[in-house]
C-alpha cells in the first residue's frame, strides 16, 4: 500500500474546519457558524512536534460535491495543466478522466510539457482497470509518460507542477470524484512543498514500469479486448 497524506497546521486548518461544518450541515441540517469553532491559533508548539505553528506557505482548501455550482477541484487540475511550462506529475489509483482533464493533459504533452501519470499496476477493481486502458493508450499517443507502480497498491492522489504548486487530497482523476463525490484537496503554492512532492514521485518511479518503453507488441490487444474496453469506458461516468 502506497499513499500520500499531509498534516496541515496554521491558518489553512480553518479551511478544513469549514469543510467539515459544511458537510455536517449537508447531513444533519444543523448550521454551525459560531466563531467558537474557529479559535485563535496558539503560538505554543504543536503536540508531538518541536516546532511552533507557522504559516510557511500559501495553501488553499478546495472542495467539490454534488451540490457545488462548479467542479472546483477539476478546474484546479485543468488550470495546472494548461499553465505548466516544464512538467506536471500526477498520481491516482483510478484514471477515467473527464473530457476537460483529458484534453488538458494531451494539449500540455503535445505542447512540450513533461506530463507524467502514475497508476497502480494491479488495481482493486477489474472493470475500472479495463476502462482505464483506453484512456492510457490515448494519452500515451499524445506523449504523456505513463508509469505502472508495482511496489504495492498505489492510493496516492497528488499533482505537482513546475516546482511551484502541488495538490494532495481525496480526489481521484475520474468522473465521480470530480463531479459526484464529496471530495477535498489542499492546493499548495510554494516551491519547497512542490519539490517535496516531486521528489516523492521520482522515488516511486524506481518501483514502476514505464509503459511507453515497452515494445509495441506488448501493448497490442485483441479485437474483443478492445471491444470490452470500449464498453466499460461508456460506463466510466458512473464507476
Give names to the regions the model predicted:
Residues 1-239:
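Charged, low-complexity intrinsically disordered terminal segments
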Amino acid at each position: 500500500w502506497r499513499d500520500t497524506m499531509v498534516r496541515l497546521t496554521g491558518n489553512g486548518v480553518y479551511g478544513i474546519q469549514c469543510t467539515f461544518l459544511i458537510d455536517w450541515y449537508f447531513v444533519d441540517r444543523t448550521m454551525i457558524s459560531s466563531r467558537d469553532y474557529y479559535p485563535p491559533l496558539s503560538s505554543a508548539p504543536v503536540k508531538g512536534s518541536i516546532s511552533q505553528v507557522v504559516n510557511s506557505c500559501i495553501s488553499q482548501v478546495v472542495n467539490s460535491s454534488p451540490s457545488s455550482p462548479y467542479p472546483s477541484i477539476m478546474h484546479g487540475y485543468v488550470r495546472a495543466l494548461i499553465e505548466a511550462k516544464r512538467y506536471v506529475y500526477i498520481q491516482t489509483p483510478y484514471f477515467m478522466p473527464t473530457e476537460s482533464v483529458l484534453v488538458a493533459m494531451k494539449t500540455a504533452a503535445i505542447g512540450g510539457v513533461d506530463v507524467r501519470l502514475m497508476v497502480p499496476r494491479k488495481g482493486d477493481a477489474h472493470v475500472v482497470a479495463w476502462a482505464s486502458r483506453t484512456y492510457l493508450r490515448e494519452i500515451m499517443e499524445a506523449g504523456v509518460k505513463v508509469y505502472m507502480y508495482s511496489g504495492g497498491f498505489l492510493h496516492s492522489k497528488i499533482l505537482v507542477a513546475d516546482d511551484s504548486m502541488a495538490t494532495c487530497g481525496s480526489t481521484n482523476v475520474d468522473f465521480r470524484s470530480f463531479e459526484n463525490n464529496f471530495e477535498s484537496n489542499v492546493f499548495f503554492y510554494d516551491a519547497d512543498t512542490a519539490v517535496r512532492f516531486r521528489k516523492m514521485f521520482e522515488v516511486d518511479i524506481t518501483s514502476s514500469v514505464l509503459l511507453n518503453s515497452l515494445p509495441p507488441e506488448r501493448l497490442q490487444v485483441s479485437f474483443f479486448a478492445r471491444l470490452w474496453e470500449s464498453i466499460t469506458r461508456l460506463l466510466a461516468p458512473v464507476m
